[in-house]
Amino acid sequence: MHSAVGRVSSWLTLMLALAGLVDPARAGELPPPPEKVPDMLMTLELAPVVNGATRRQTIPVRYQQGRASVRREDLENMGVPVPRGNEVWLEERDLPQIELEYDAPRQRLLITVPPTQLKRQYLGAPMRERPRAESGQGALFNYDLYSSHQSDYRYASLWHEARGFGDRGVISTTGRWRQTLSGADTGQSGYLRYDSWWRFHDTDTMNAWQFGDLISGALAWSRSVRMGGIKFARDFSLRPDLVTYPLPTFDGTSAVPGTVDLFVNGYRSRSLEIDPGPFTLTDVPYINGAGEAVVVTKDAQGRRVATTVPFYVTSDLLEAGLADYDLSVGALRRNYARRSMDYGTPAASGVYRYGLNDTLTLETHGELADGLSLAGIGGVMRLGRLGVLNLAASGSQHDEGNGWQQSVGYQYTRSGFNIGVQHSRRDEDFSDLSGLGLEDAVYGRSSTQVNASTALGALGSISAGYFDTRSVDDTRTRLVNLSWNRSLWQRSNLFVSGNRTLDGEGWSVSAQLVLPLGQRGTLSSAIERQPADGGSRQRLEYDRSGPIEGGLGWRLGYDRASQGKDYRQAELSWRGDRVETRVGIFGDRDNTTWWGEATGAVVAMGGDVLLSRQINDAFVLVSTEGQADIPVKYEHRTIGRTDDRGHQLIPWVTPWYQAMVGIDTMGLPPDMQAERVRQPVSVRAGSGYLMRFPVYRVRVAGIRLEMANGEPVPLGSLAVLTDSGAQAPVGYDGLVYFEQLSEHEHLIVTTPNGHACDVELTLPEDDDTRRTPGPYRCELPASASKGHVEKIR
């Protein structure tokens, strides 16, 4: 007993002694942090900060004895320059002029790099996935039915295009039938074929193949011809997003994170965030001619640095490394629009353009036929900010002799000013495919044209032109043109122009005032004076085009002549979804012509045949799966409503361009739903695409479920429709919400505690969505997989 008491007293004595060593004022404080980081090797996950720019991801950092080391690949990914070698981990001593600092409180690694050594940033438009151009399978028949009645002469004509399209290209043929109904036959009655061809586009290579009737490619200093044969060419229209000419780039360097603003000709066009280091700004707007850009960089402290960069841009150049070409081989076509099948000499024609660099584009052209060969070379060169120079020369060998053709031109454009000069000359014996076999062809021996225009601010703009041509028989024509236009009030415009043949009798002068009246149309008035007879004409015209979504339009015009007879015209038009019609009258008091026209198309697509307006290129057929009177939108503009079969055709779609097509479901009743309301689409040239926007009727109901004791089915229970597999959670008061219900449904309900029951639903025949059917009672627990449920009211 005494020993136990002694042990307790010893422990108490020791505890009191220890308590006396502790300062009560410091009893609740933590021990102080170590004054220095331990010398042991640590691997830390730190947020890297390069010249003040924090990276999103963390990287592993080794730290020992005050030195940090970073993996080579992490530095490279951040754009930090590293020396060559095989070392995986690099310390500060391995990185010249680069500092590494461990920020322990904020768990960061501060990396300081000379701005010029950082990886260059290329700031451009975000790369977007190129949309796949679509094409459905189908066919169409365009028509233009026209009839005219003048005095005792009447005739009718029908122009047509029959076209088929699909994944393998487009096939088309055009022609015209004409018949004299009364009066003397002019010899134009009968059928005349124009063009027949098959065309295929390769979107990956931007190449196009065409078989049949074609027009050969040409340069500014050569001429195209009609042929029947094969054509292989580059087609840049397949890529509307592609800029084929060189655009300027703007370089700079930022020491810290900030923003860069680009001002072009005084207008801010871009504002982008940048990281420290050198940068190249490539996201510039589409510009043309001479101009001035100002690049303004701003750091986090608001300091600004502005750099002015002059530039000159022309679309006549090709971007460096880009090629454009056209090769046509076949038989020359003669008497086009006069004979259906008239092909002659076999021939070949080709052009090729290549962007050697951003200032020079080379051009070549060649032609070959029986007894004719031609070759030419040229180039387009940008002269710094001074404009664009073009030069070309070509020579031909022909049975009747050899000849040369030369051309030279200059163009300068800037905001509010433009000037251009072009001169060409050709020998009398120079020949090409366009004149082959045409004995009476007369071509110009030389041609000179000069044009200039400038803006006058509030006074409008003025332009002038001089044209001088000399034919092979030494006939010379010189013409001077002057024009001035100015915007007046509320988008009205005044145009004044004058023309004079230097070897003629005087000036031909005209003035026109155009007054837009908004949705009510356009009113214009003009006066003309002719030097030949010294007479004048006054013209008054009113034009109200039919709305694009359909409707009525008309045009009225009256010409009063000081010498001669007055001229009158009137036209009435109707634009519908299925056809466009026009009727009109024109002429003077003694010679009047009545005419009428109907244009449209018949389209076979998607297992259906429908009527439409004339379709000149691509189109989209919208289908709502039989739901009528639903508004259809193209590029966010309502263009019509679906017909009784749920169709609306959009006949003026721009090919290869991604456009937004959609439907407006705001007017649908609550029991109607659409799977989607808009979708972007790109359609191949000459093709059509069927876009389905399924709109269907749904039976919507909120069903009330009760347990055997009259309490609602527990919150969080899961209800499943056995037929469709649709699931829905049970909410408060035993309510469960389902869409697309039929009159009879089999329902399985599983409570949170795992019990299940079957519910046989018999919904009311009426479709009143405001009612809540039920309650339906579940007997829990259910035996096996089936319980007993009865409707209690």
Where are these regions (language model features)?
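Short, acidic Ser/Thr/Gly-rich low-complexity loop/linker segments typical of extracellular
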Residues: 637-646, 724-735
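Short, ordered, surface-exposed loop/turn motifs in non-cytosolic proteins
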Residues: 39-46, 54-59, 626-636, 709-723
